[in-house]
A protein has these predicted regions:
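Hydrophobic alpha-helical segments
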Residues: 1-142
Length: 142
């Protein structure tokens, strides 16, 4: 097993579940039905197979997540990713922070904001500016 990553990063780390994912061939009808709410049309990944161990939660979680991250109106996609980074930092979820930081940097074509947030925290000017934009965007929708 690889050593756990202990610092925030914009590079998406390898993810390995700590529980054994569901074997698709052994999935119940309820689990198969729950996996239909996922957005992938290519394959069902290990993450979804882990979530499918609790099909009721998966059926609720996926539409909620998709509504927050991809819904029409509200914050821009980059602002949504920045908000997801903030939530991931508060929750100390290094993997989720990396996924959302990477996507934010792709959307904005600017890695300096995430580098600044992860290196210097919210006190750095570039991080303060991004956080201020996010706060203003949230206030405009409140």
């Amino acid at each position: 097993m690889n050593e756990p990553i202990k610092e925030f990063t914009s590079s998406i780390p390898y993810w390995q579940p700590r529980v054994i994912p569901l074997e698709l061939e052994q999935a119940s009808d309820e689990q198969l039905d729950a996996m239909k709410v996922t957005v992938s049309n290519t394959k069902i990944g290990e993450y979804t197979l882990v979530l499918a161990l609790d099909p009721e939660t998966l059926q609720q979680r996926t539409p909620l997540f998709n509504g927050i991250m991809y819904g029409r109106g509200g914050l821009s996609r980059a602002e949504t990713e920045l908000g997801a980074v903030a939530a991931s930092v508060v929750n100390r979820c290094i993997y989720c922070a990396a996924v959302h930081a990477n996507r934010y940097s792709q959307l904005t074509k600017d890695e300096s904001v995430m580098d600044s947030i992860f290196t210097d925290g919210e006190e750095r000017d570039v991080a303060k500016e991004a956080i201020s934009r996010l706060n203003n965007a949230v206030k405009s929708w409140a």
